[in-house]
UniProtKB/Swiss-Prot annotation:
UniProt-listed GO biological process terms: 10-formyltetrahydrofolate biosynthetic process; dTMP biosynthetic process; methylation; one-carbon metabolic process
Sequence positions that bind substrate: V25, D47, I134, T155
Quaternary structure note: Heterodimer or homodimer.
Organism: Arabidopsis thaliana (Mouse-ear cress)
Cited InterPro entries: DHFR-like_dom_sf, DHFR-TS, DHFR_CS, DHFR_dom, Thymidate_synth/dCMP_Mease, Thymidate_synth/dCMP_Mease_dom, Thymidate_synth/dCMP_Mease_sf, Thymidylate_synthase
Annotated residues for binding of dUMP: R256, H402, Q420, R421, S422, A423, D424, N432, H462, V463, Y464
Record GO terms (molecular function): dihydrofolate reductase activity; thymidylate synthase activity
Keyword hit for NADP: yes
Pathway: Cofactor biosynthesis; tetrahydrofolate biosynthesis; 5,6,7,8-tetrahydrofolate from 7,8-dihydrofolate: step 1/1
Gene: THY-1
Name by which UniProt lists this protein: Bifunctional dihydrofolate reductase-thymidylate synthase 1
Region (Thymidylate synthase): 235-519
Keyword set, alphabetical order: Acetylation, Methyltransferase, Multifunctional enzyme, NADP, Nucleotide biosynthesis, One-carbon metabolism, Oxidoreductase, Transferase
Location of N-acetylalanine modifications: A2
Amino acid sequence: MATTTLNDSVTTTLASEPQRTYQVVVAATKEMGIGKDGKLPWNLPTDLKFFKDITLTTSDSSKKNAVVMGRKTWESIPIKYRPLSGRLNVVLTRSGGFDIANTENVVTCSSVDSALDLLAAPPYCLSIERVFVIGGGDILREALNRPSCDAIHLTEIDTSVDCDTFIPAIDTSVYQPWSSSFPVTENGLRFCFTTFVRVKSSADESSDESNGSQSLQFDGKKFLFLPKMVFDQHEEFLYLNMVEDIISNGNVKNDRTGTGTLSKFGCQMKFNLRRSFPLLTTKRVFWRGVVEELLWFISGSTNAKVLQEKGIHIWDGNASREYLDGIGLTEREEGDLGPVYGFQWRHFGAKYTDMHADYTGQGFDQLVDVIDKIKNNPDDRRIIMSAWNPSDLKLMALPPCHMFAQFYVAEGELSCQMYQRSADMGLGVPFNIASYSLLTCMLAHVCDLVPGDFIHVLGDAHVYKTHVRPLQEQLLNLPKPFPVMKINPEKKQIDSFVASDFDLTGYDPHKKIEMKMAV
């Protein structure tokens, strides 16, 4: 298509048409610096490839995308690369002397609004799949947080770079992270790719309180506008794809409960804790239960009644009189789980008597040791906490499933790798992902670090046969943005936290899906 200029008369004609929404693609430093002397102040080939891939690729091969840019941005593109091939180049200029006559795939407009009006009308509404605003500074300052901006694809440059052009910070009251890549380093610069999606039309839009979190109530299908290369990067697909694979290809196995499972061995998921919190959204996960159980572990308690009194009943089945008698713990008081997780974390090696005893100063406090090593010897390869104590297994109501955690410090970040010998994909794993992610965030907080990665290694990853149908229902749901979790900055001691110290915002999952626990 030859060059087109949109004038005021055409703008008037298009005023009745709805404007196109758009997505922003930009690379910026922590200070939101984007340029120096009219140029990019970095050389990041991986970022340039990402820019090309996201702006060029369409799901419909008969369509193309549009890239909207200011005149200075156009002129900063090397002549041999302009116009950007395979895309409609929309150049914003009010200069009458700007001449790009006879240039294919280029149109000029006088403003962002006039460009969006043009792209909403024929023929462009039929031929353009997505609209990307790509710069420069003036255009991005106007476009970044407008209601018509659906998403922001931000290359976050973690290293300080001298810039003279800046854009506003992303308004996190209306945008939430959809995906964030793991950091990489190229030409001395550390960076990652993060996509933010609009979840509210404005910061004033109300939210509801639900399940101990602030809920925004948005539809998972709303985010299908994202390029597939971005949509598929949502980390919940790691879990969903694993469940689907186990149901389709798992080994048929018997188990101690007599229920029967489909099982695979040696699976792994890796979650990025830097921007969001991996609380699954394709079904509701009991966040308050996650928090209270972890605090119960940290306290060293083995008394299921402590959780019961708070309305948390996840341990009831393994603490009942019938169950304890059934595994030979006939002398054990109902509710006494024996030397399970919290006892091993805080009193490893101590002799267990019952849930009422005071074990202060007894055994080895692994949690305190982990914190001490993170603070004082962060390069130690022995920053480890184990709940697996063979000499105590016979005394436990249930041997530990999530049994071994190793912590790793680098770049001012704390990461955790946890090994889980037995992984109930339907009920347990969503809880375990959240629990160890929260533990990592807590330890980072008390050690003045920031959360990094949570790597979840699963030994026997299984789906109970009774969970196949509800999990197939869950697989039909599309993910929504993970929530954001913040910790009370006033609390710096691991034993000082209470449930209200954890602020979870933007959690709006699909409905709860019932699954019966196999005991």
